[in-house]
C-alpha cells in the first residue's frame, strides 16, 4: 500500500540567499548567450544586406559601425558567440564521454570555459576597437 506522506520541509523564498553551483551558472549563461546570438543574427544580416546593397549602403553601414555604442554592442555579440561556442564544445565533450561527468570535472571545465571566454572577449575587444 502506498502512503501519501506530505513532508514538512522548510521553504526558502529569499532568492538572494540561493547560491547556484558554477555548473548551473555556466548552463544558464549558455542558454542566455544562445538567445543573444539568435537575435544578433538578424541584426547582423540586416547590416550585411545594407552594406552589400550599394556603395551608399556600404557607407551607411560603415557610419553605423563607427559609433561607440554600436562597437560596444558588437563586442557583446562577439563575446556571447564565443561563450556559446566554448560552452557548447564543453557540453559536446561531456556528451561524447571525453570529459568525466562528475561534479568536480564539471566545475573544472566550467572554470576553464570562463577563462577561455575572457581571453576571446579581450581579443574581440581588440578586433572591434
Swiss-Prot record:
Periplasmic side of membrane? 53-68
What is the protein's species of origin? Answer: Salmonella typhimurium (strain LT2 / SGSC1412 / ATCC 700720)
Q: How does it sit in the membrane?
A: Multi-pass membrane protein
Q: Which family does it belong to?
A: Belongs to the cytochrome b560 family.
List keywords of the entry alphabetically. Cell inner membrane, Cell membrane, Electron transport, Heme, Iron, Membrane, Metal-binding, Transmembrane, Transmembrane helix, Transport, Tricarboxylic acid cycle
Give Gene Ontology CC terms. plasma membrane
- Assembly and interactions? Part of an enzyme complex containing four subunits: a flavoprotein, an iron-sulfur protein, plus two membrane-anchoring proteins, SdhC and SdhD. The complex can form homotrimers.
List GO molecular-function terms, semicolon-separated: electron transfer activity; metal ion binding
* Designated name of the protein: Succinate dehydrogenase cytochrome b556 subunit
Against Pfam families, the record matches this protein to:
Sdh_cyt
Cofactors demanded by this protein: heme
Annotated transmembrane regions: 27-52, 69-89, 109-129
Q: Name one GO biological process term.
A: tricarboxylic acid cycle
State its location(s): Cell inner membrane
Q: Does the keyword Protease apply?
A: no
